[in-house]
Regions:
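Active-site donor-binding acidic/aromatic loop of nucleotide-activated sugar
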Residues: 332-341, 358
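Catalytic binding pocket for nucleotide-activated donors in carbohydrate/polymer assembly enzymes
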Residues: 353, 357-422, 426-432
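Short acidic alpha-helix that forms the nucleotide-activated donor recognition element
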Residues: 195-198, 203, 340-352, 371
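C-terminal alpha-helical cap of glycosyltransferases
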Residues: 438-456
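Conserved catalytic-core segment of nucleotide-activated headgroup transferases in glycan assembly
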Residues: 132-142, 256-328, 334-337
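Short N-terminal targeting/anchoring amphipathic segment
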Residues: 200-215
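Active-site-proximal region of nucleotide-activated glycan assembly enzymes
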Residues: 77, 81-90, 226-266
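N-terminal subdomain of nucleotide-sugar transferases
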Residues: 76-172, 176-178
Length: 456
């Protein structure tokens, strides 16, 4: 049977038509044609059919697990380009199960070094746009202060693949403060992972830190080969297979905001059109999660109470709902939308207090505010729940509210009372220096590694 019309539509850029025709072709061939499977998932991606892409790519990947692991990972990686609804928890669990089956048994006879002297960091790339690059640099420099040598091994998972067929590395000329080994992009995902694992073994590592989970298939596949005596997962919590790791630490919170504020020329209130502001608050992060929340009600109340108070928003997301609400409250003229910013360090100097949005936490931006010594007002939720992440990070009782009205009261007190604001800033900064300063990152991970060694 000929599928020329389907491929012609794809070639001509009619992705909607191509995806419909290629779906039929894939069904008719039982999802066994490499050419059609690739074209079908490409058409879905180009057409923006994210749910369907996640489902189709997962189905294809699962069918290849036993016969072609490299291609299976390729399609699982495509599935992650789909929406969270398409790749649901059940599918995530299934992928984790597959990686567990691929995981090599732990060599209990292998000697674990004490003290640790050499560690490997496995990361997708060291691109400037990749937040993990800054995190790896913080950890490597912290470990170096304790006499521990680091080497970064990139996987370059997004190069020479699917929508990015170019064979060039995405890693840029960034200095993580240690040696960097950039992965070759030759071969399939399985072959690429095997080479990286062999390089880590040859390096003579004591510990390997993996800075990504299942969303970077090659990175997790490297872990399944167990190239290090102790393996630490240091990526986003809940996004990996547990089997290959001795420590599921996740990315322990830390911020290099102090260094970034020194490196970025500071904005001024005059330069931002805030000359008339008596005080300024801010909220940074994914603004899509702000609209319609009780947080907006609290912000509107604060702005109404203090006619010379201004507020800054920075981040991605549709702000129509935010603007509409604040316009209805009559306070929109004193709100500035800065859009998506690669780094908020330059505007931290104009901020007096940081208002953490709720219920959705904004860990990275909030931690930057804490590190900049800004009093952060946050809402408490039951301990251990995801929504309580903001409160747990702030950790200063006087800044934590148990209800929306109290949230507003705390913010208003800080706006009104400079002395209270300075006292809160000192408390927040002291907590940051003790718990989240980059220099503390290495020792925090090493304590977890030591627990593994003692139980070996």
């Amino acid at each position: 049977m000929s599928y020329e019309k389907a491929f012609e539509a794809l070639k001509e850029g009619d992705f909607k038509a191509a995806s419909a025709l290629l779906e039929k072709a894939a069904e008719e061939t039982g999802f066994e044609s490499d050419l059609i499977n690739h074209a079908y998932t490409l058409a879905l991606y180009r057409a923006g059919e994210k749910d369907q892409l996640a489902q189709a790519a997962f189905r294809i990947g699962e069918s290849l697990v036993d016969t072609d692991p490299g291609s299976a990972m390729d399609y699982f990686q495509r599935a992650f380009l789909g929406s969270p609804d398409g790749l649901n928890a059940a599918k995530m669990s299934r992928i984790a199960e597959i990686f567990a089956l691929w995981t090599a048994p732990k060599d209990t006879s292998e000697q674990i070094a004490h003290p640790v002297r050499k560690v490997a960091h496995i990361v997708g790339s060291l691109a400037a746009s990749h937040p993990t690059a800054a995190y790896v640099r913080m950890l490597a420099l912290s470990l170096k202060q304790h006499g521990i040598e680091s080497v970064v091994f990139t996987t370059e998972w997004s190069s020479s693949w699917f929508v990015n067929p170019a064979g060039e590395s995405e890693t840029q000329n960034l200095d993580p403060g240690c040696e960097v080994v950039i992965a070759s992009v030759d071969g399939d995902f399985n072959e690429r992972a095997q080479r990286i694992a062999a390089s880590i073994r040859a390096y003579g590592r004591d510990v390997a830190f993996y800075h990504a989970g299942l969303r970077e298939q090659i990175t997790t596949r490297v872990a399944t080969f167990r190239p290090a005596p102790i393996q630490v997962y240091a990526g986003r919590p809940g996004e990996t297979a547990a089997a290959p790791f001795d420590v599921l630490a996740g990315a322990l919170p830390a911020s290099d905001i102090e260094e970034r504020m020194q490196a970025n020329p500071p904005s001024t209130r005059q330069g931002m059109g805030l000359e008339s502001a008596a005080s300024v608050s801010a909220t940074f992060g994914n603004l899509q999660k702000v609209g319609g929340s009780g947080y907006l009600h609290a912000l509107g109340e604060i702005l109404q109470r203090f006619p010379k108070h201004f507020h800054l928003f920075a981040g991605s997301g549709d702000v129509k709902a935010i603007r509409a609400y604040l316009h209805a409250e009559g306070v929109l003229p004193r709100v500035r939308f800065l859009g998506a910013m690669s780094d908020v360090a330059s505007v931290m100097g104009v901020v007096d207090i940081y208002l953490a949005s709720f219920p959705h936490p904004g860990d990275t931006a909030l931690l930057d505010a804490v590190g900049a010594g800004k009093p952060v007002v946050a809402l408490r939720y039951p301990p251990g729940t995801p929504y309580n992440a903001n409160a747990e990070m702030v950790g200063v009782p006087e800044l934590l509210a148990s209800r929306e009205a109290e949230y507003s009261e705390i913010a208003m007190r800080l706006i009104r009372d400079r002395e209270a604001r300075e006292k809160a800033a000192a408390a927040v900064l002291a907590r940051f220096q003790k718990e989240f300063h980059p220099s503390s990152l290495g020792p925090r991970y090493l304590r977890l590694v030591e627990e593994v060694r003692e139980n070996h």
